[in-house]
Structure formats: structure tokens, C-alpha cells
From Swiss-Prot:
Subcellular location, record wording: Cytoplasm
Names of the cofactor(s): Mg(2+)
Keyword terms: Cytoplasm, Fatty acid biosynthesis, Fatty acid metabolism, Lipid biosynthesis, Lipid metabolism, Magnesium, Metal-binding, Transferase
The name this protein goes by in its record: Holo-[acyl-carrier-protein] synthase
Residue ranges of the TM segments: none
EC supergroup of this enzyme: transferase
Residues the record lists as binding Mg(2+): D8, E50
Naturally occurring in which organism (per UniProt): Nocardioides sp. (strain ATCC BAA-499 / JS614)
Length: 116
């Protein structure tokens, strides 16, 4: 059963400007492993975190580091959730978090589906 769905899009260039203009923003949004990725990948990961927040009902007190995107050997993105995000997911009865990322033509996008 579907528990929640979220989608988000990010303008890659504008996101890059925000990261460069705001000291510490990269560290607030991304884990050290995520932060090593190129800009388009960071934008897609931010879109995924925003989409996850929407799917969870925009929980108060959500910490960005509690939703980390890792890649399986195949390259498939997967969320590793913990802390505030895991608590909210458990409250909603989430058993699986599905995520799809894309970036092309200067736009990054992500879709998240929460399943019981």
C-alpha cells in the first residue's frame, strides 16, 4: 500500500549559486559522502530529500543528514534513513522507500514513493 508520494525539481545552476553564496549550506544539507558528488548529482539528491519530506508530510524537526542517498553497486540510488526521518517513517508504517533521480538540461528531479 502506498503511504506517501513526493516529487521535487531543482534548477542545477541556481542551486550551485545558493551553495556557493551560503557558507556551510553544503555541510547542512549533505553528509560528507554525498558532498563529494558533482553539482548535478547534489541537486538531484537535494530534490530527493525535498521529495521525501513531502512524502512524509513535511515533518517538523527533520534533519537533512537523517536522509542520506547512497548508490548500490548497480548505481541505483537508495535512501538510508535514520533519526528524525526514521521515526516519522515508522509512525506512518513505512516499510520501503523508493527513490528515482534524474538530471538533464540543467534540471534535477526526484520522485519518492513510500510503501507500507
Amino acid at each position: 500500500m502506498i503511504v506517501g508520494v513526493g516529487i521535487d525539481v531543482v534548477d542545477v545552476a541556481r542551486f550551485g549559486v545558493s551553495l556557493s553564496r551560503t557558507p556551510g549550506l553544503t555541510d547542512r544539507l549533505f553528509t560528507p559522502e554525498e558532498a563529494e558528488r558533482p553539482l548535478a548529482s547534489l541537486a538531484a539528491r537535494f530534490a530527493a530529500k525535498e521529495a521525501l519530506a513531502k512524502a512524509l508530510g513535511a515533518p517538523e524537526g527533520m534533519h537533512w543528514h537523517d536522509a542520506e542517498i547512497r548508490s548500490e553497486e548497480s548505481g541505483r540510488p537508495v535512501f538510508e534513513i535514520r533519526g528524525s526521518v526514521l521515526r516519522r517513517a515508522n509512525d506512518l508504517g513505512v516499510g520501503s522507500v523508493h527513490v528515482s533521480l534524474s538530471h538533464d538540461a540543467g534540471i534535477a528531479s526526484a520522485v519518492v514513493v513510500l510503501e507500507s
